[in-house]
């Protein structure tokens, strides 16, 4: 029975892993996954939208795009991060989501991470 549940779980993980996000169109081009469309209103590249990667830890970020789905200067944060006011003058930066820290990641059992890696490998 446990084996059947493990097989079902692996198949479910594979199905979700293969689902693709709807690509973002930016300046007539499709952005890669984990990116957004930014249209700077200042300096070089003014008014030409371009694809940029989602924010990483401590990168500047934005929360909401305009009505066309375009961000004015920075992408939102990548997975596991949230756009949070940090320091003075309260600039928005990508920070670990509350409740998550390196220690909590380290304290997770190795069985869980091994199972996840096995699932990824079996997806092809």
From Swiss-Prot:
Q: Name one GO molecular function term.
A: toxin activity
Name the UniProt key words of this record, in alphabetical order: Disulfide bond, Secreted, Signal, Toxin
Instruction: Provide a GO CC annotation, any one.
Output: extracellular region
Q: Say if the entry is tagged with keyword Ribonucleoprotein.
A: no
Chain segments carrying region Disordered: 93-124
Annotated signal sequence is 1-17
Q: Where, subcellularly, is it found?
A: Secreted
The disulfides recorded in the entry are 26-37, 31-51, 36-75, 61-83, 77-94
Q: Tissue expression, per UniProt?
A: Expressed by the venom gland.
List where Basic and acidic residues composition bias occurs.
93-108
Q: Where do Acidic residues bias regions lie?
A: 109-118
- Keyword Chloroplast, does the record have it? no
User: What family is this?
Assistant: Belongs to the neurotoxin 32 family.
Q: What is this protein called?
A: U33-theraphotoxin-Cg1a
């Amino acid at each position: 029975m446990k084996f059947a549940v493990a097989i079902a779980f692996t198949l479910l993980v594979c199905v979700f892993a293969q689902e693709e996000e709807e690509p973002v169109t930016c300046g007539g081009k499709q952005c890669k996954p984990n990116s957004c469309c930014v249209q700077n209103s200042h300096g070089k590249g003014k008014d030409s939208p371009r694809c940029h990667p989602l924010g990483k830890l401590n990168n500047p970020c934005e929360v909401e795009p305009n009505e066309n789905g375009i961000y004015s200067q920075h992408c939102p944060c990548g997975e596991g991060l949230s756009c949070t006011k940090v320091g003075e003058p309260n600039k928005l930066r990508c920070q670990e989501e509350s409740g998550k820290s390196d220690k909590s990641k380290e304290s997770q059992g190795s069985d869980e991470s091994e199972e996840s890696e096995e699932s990824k490998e079996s997806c092809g």
